Curated annotation (Swiss-Prot):
Job description of the protein: Zinc phosphodiesterase, which displays some tRNA 3'-processing endonuclease activity. Probably involved in tRNA maturation, by removing a 3'-trailer from precursor tRNA.
Taxonomic lineage: Bacteria, Bacillati, Cyanobacteriota, Cyanophyceae, Nostocales
Reactions mediated catalytically: Endonucleolytic cleavage of RNA, removing extra 3' nucleotides from tRNA precursor, generating 3' termini of tRNAs. A 3'-hydroxy group is left at the tRNA terminus and a 5'-phosphoryl group is left at the trailer molecule
Record's subunit section: Homodimer.
Encoding gene per record: rnz
Molecular functions per Gene Ontology: 3'-tRNA processing endoribonuclease activity; zinc ion binding
Record protein name field: Ribonuclease Z
Domain of life according to the entry: Bacteria
Amino-acid positions noted as binding Zn(2+) 2 in the UniProt annotation, renumbered to this chain: 66-67, 210, 268
Amino acid sequence: MQITFLGTSSGVPTRSRNVSSVALRLPQRAELWLFDCGEGTQHQIMRSELKISQLSRIFITHMHGDHIFGLMGLLATCGLAGNVERIDIYGPPGLNDYIQSASRYSYTHFSYPIKVHAIRPGVIYEDDYFTVSCGNLHHRITAFGYRVAEKDRTGRFDVEKAKALDIPSGRIYGQLKRGETVILDDGRVIDGTQLCGPTEIGRKIAYCTDTIYCDGAVELAHDADVLIHEATFAHQDADMAFQRLHSTTTMAAQTALAAGAHRLIMSHFSPRYAPGNTLELKDLLKEARAIFPRTDMAYDFMIHEVPRRREVELTKVGV
């Protein structure tokens, strides 16, 4: 799983940062999921190594413009490219009306199916490999955070051990690789889990923006390998954060700490902390790391690989 940050500024773009969008690349299935779609997102995708043709799902947190103004342009481009089979879009009530109205008034007709899902807290998508859920955040308008949880899978199959037990290859190997119990022709009962390595723990990613510190974000980020959390303001500007219902760096760090997350990546920074100002982004990073040391600061086109965890590794660190 690979995370690419396409936009890391809050409210408005700057020369070095576009507005909100994060891409999740799933190489094992040549699929791309997008979280928020601020103005200019399609340009950011084109400047990256991502492929628009692989886009299959878009998750919108809320209906503020810096999170949705790039959506119609991206969808129109997907149609003109002609190589997108279908896109499912998930978001708050009103998202479908927005897309339909923009399409009608701009005379935009899509050459591929688009399905808009009005979400409510809970599981919103599930397949054999992933579960995606959402939860309420605390912002000025209805806002949702997302959690992508990869399902655990059986560890690596020990072919040599299977051969040593004179287990015939073929269909039976497939069953054993899945951890199933198989009865051989000679009557032996083989437990597939005994021929597989440690269970590969599914990776978990949480995406929480826009919000002030809230229990909903903590729940979504529980045991997350990566928590992507907004950090619009520095701690000294907490009054503005409470007024506008955005997070400070310390709120983001406290969320990661309370959730037991393994890594925090902050994003959605106010342009007021540009280089040369009294407070700069490097100062915001220090604030967060004082509370949660495993904190990084996102920048446009930053790529973060999410490694797998194994039960043995978790036992060693006492998780």
